[in-house]
Amino acid sequence: MHTCKSLLLTLFIVQFVYSTEKIRFKSPDSVLIKQTLDSLLSDKNLMALHYEILNYNDEFKEITYQPLYVSYDVDTVIINSNENIKQSYLKHVAKNFSDIKIDRKSNKNIEKKKKTIINKYYFIRSTPDINVFKYQREKLGLHVDINSTFNNYFSALFGGTKAQKDRWEYNGEIDAHFENVWGAMEKLIFKWIAIDSINQKFNFELHRPHLIKGGMGLILNSNYELVNNDYVQKKYDLKVELLNSFYGSFYAGYTQGSINATYNGKERGFISSNYKALAFMFNNNSLDDMILPIKGSKTNFELEIGEDSNFKNLYIKYRQDFERYFPITKNINSCFKFYAEYINAFNNDVGKAREVLFGGVNSLRGYDNNLFRSPYVSIPTFEFHYNGIKSFNSLVFFECGFSKNYKPKLSYGFGVKKITNNALINIEYAIPHTAPINEAKVHIKWLTRL
């Protein structure tokens, strides 16, 4: 009983002195002192924290300890991945931790580093396990376990409709997505979309988190688009990563493009032009999953400042994509999405060919693809998801499109998404607000996982 009272009294004193960062003991009980200090060290979980004797009286009836914070350099960082990534690229991942010191702020700094690599690397969606270890007596190292998730898939859909008596219109889509094919953490995307024979789009993207020597990130984009047989637009983008931290990644680069109006397009007021611009991008990604996210957010902001052969002054263009997932209950979560795009030529009309096209599965569901055209558009979306069944997601959504040339466009609908080891199936049924139910659009996407 006496021991319990002493321990409770000591804990009370420790708790009181803890706020002042000094600890006083009333007796030279070495076992009690060791247990108390070990407990405090365990609670704070700081390797850099030690306790040293500050003072004591002649009879050892009052002993005072004070915290001592030291600083250690990390000599070695070991990165372990569950996927096959080349060591030369894992070394670049390790560099994210090279400036860490084991000191008073090490726990906070390690948490920031965890957020940094989740933001930078699209294939890391869960928090890495990080442990500090000792080797060769006095040297310290970090062991980082990353859970890499790469998605490789391919889909191809084709169809046809008889537009006239002896003429058929074809449509289709090819979507090829490859990740870490060469063990370099790269991402390759190829898309072909044909709404009909006079509306087609080809797109190629290459994402490299690191180049072999310099280690900087790179994004390359090439785009070809035929729009209603009025004009052909070609566009090329190159962006390099300038800065990466726990709050986001910053890119800068160059954009160049051209618009070639057809004879039919010129008759309808479309004008050929060439343009070039400086491009800037900010990206942040904390989603817990790239296919079926439940929590986290994703932000992408792009800005162009450049010149066009049809404009006397500079033009500015920006695009913003944002999505945030909020868990409501264990199996239900809400999602808010926001898409906006804007172009403005100072003291000039931007022209129809440079306006923003929107409508369809990726921008205002329930309407035909690229049905609308405007200098700016913003589309907020609210979704509610049910994910009580593993690898299965159902949703209802409401979205509205705001633009300069049209009244607000509303749509609503529901959908299901199913993931198996071999495929991903996504079906959405979307209805424009003013349309009867039989004019709804069914958006179907089938991906074969490789």
PLM features per residue range, with description:
Residues 81-85, 270, 293, 415:
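A generic short alpha-helical patch detector that favors 3-5-residue windows
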Residues 16-18:
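Sec/Tat signal peptide C-region and signal peptidase I cleavage site
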